[in-house]
Regions:
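Phosphate- and divalent-cation-binding pockets in alpha/beta enzyme and binding domains
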Residues: 47, 69-72, 101, 206-210
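Glycine-rich phosphate-binding loop plus the immediately following alpha-helix
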Residues: 46-71, 107-151
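Phosphate-interacting basic helix/loop segments used at nucleotide- and nucleic-acid interfaces
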Residues: 73-88, 173-182
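Gly/Thr-rich phosphate-binding beta-strand-loop-beta motif of the actin/hexokinase/Hsp70
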Residues: 31, 79-112, 122, 127
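Active-site neighborhood for divalent-cation/phosphate handling
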Residues: 1-80, 194
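Helical "lid/coupling" subdomains associated with nucleotide-phosphate turnover
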Residues: 150-212
Length: 212
């Protein structure tokens, strides 16, 4: 079944795909198990590995980014109390320059993970368009004086509206991930009880609080 899925996606993309899969520990409401399938463009992955080897770094194995952030969470986070009668749903989100990696953890078990094309560049683009500036200039303004919270120290008020627009898009994508995650995992998810943010994009002033 996994081979068919990989071949189907590869045919649509017209590219050779590196792939792997794992069965998730959480049991679906119908008693079945969910299989998480990871895909990557083989050409792009090979280029990265070759560049690392050129610097003397040998990579034993590659891990999809959403699983990597779950691994980081599992290593350093406070785990849910499984004796508690209440469910614990953690939303993990890593916002990079051009990617958003999301994982959902229900009662310490991974139930969903995915990567989408959205990142800090979208915030910079929104700011550049609103200010009529070049991307490089907007990036500097975003890092030094940008923010989504009115009255915040060091935030230029002119940056708030465009950056908040991008933040609204990000919030919508996270909410969508929760809906899709519950559907694909085949479980009824409770409300999010904890948020775990990482990535350079999350350093924008006021963004974590806005998303909360």
């Amino acid at each position: 079944i996994m081979k068919y899925e990989v071949e189907s996606v590869a045919d649509r993309m017209g590219e050779v795909l590196a792939h792997d899969f794992k069965q998730l520990p959480a049991v679906r409401d119908d008693g079945e198990r969910t299989v998480l399938l990871g895909l990557a463009r083989e050409e792009g992955l090979s280029a990265i590995l070759e560049a690392l080897e050129g610097e003397g770094i040998l990579v034993a194995s590659s891990v999809p980014a959403p699983l990597a952030i779950y691994g980081a969470w599992e290593l350093v986070s406070t785990k849910a109390d499984l004796d508690s009668p209440d469910d614990d749903l953690v939303l993990i989100a890593d916002l990079g320059r051009s990617s958003l990696d999301v994982a959902l953890v229900l009662n310490n078990r991974l139930v969903f993970a995915r990567s989408t094309t959205f990142g800090g560049d979208q915030f910079t683009e929104a700011l550049a368009q609103d200010l009529g500036a070049e991307m490089g200039q907007a990036e500097v303004v975003k890092k030094q004086r940008g923010g989504v919270t009115e009255g915040a120290k060091g935030v230029d008020e002119r940056t708030i509206r465009p950056l908040r627009t991008a933040a609204g898009q990000l919030l919508g994508m996270l909410e969508s991930s929760i809906r899709v995650g519950g559907s694909q995992a085949g479980v009824k998810l409770p409300g999010v009880t904890r948020l775990w943010f990482s990535g350079g994009g999350m350093r924008l002033k006021g963004l974590p609080r806005y998303l909360s």
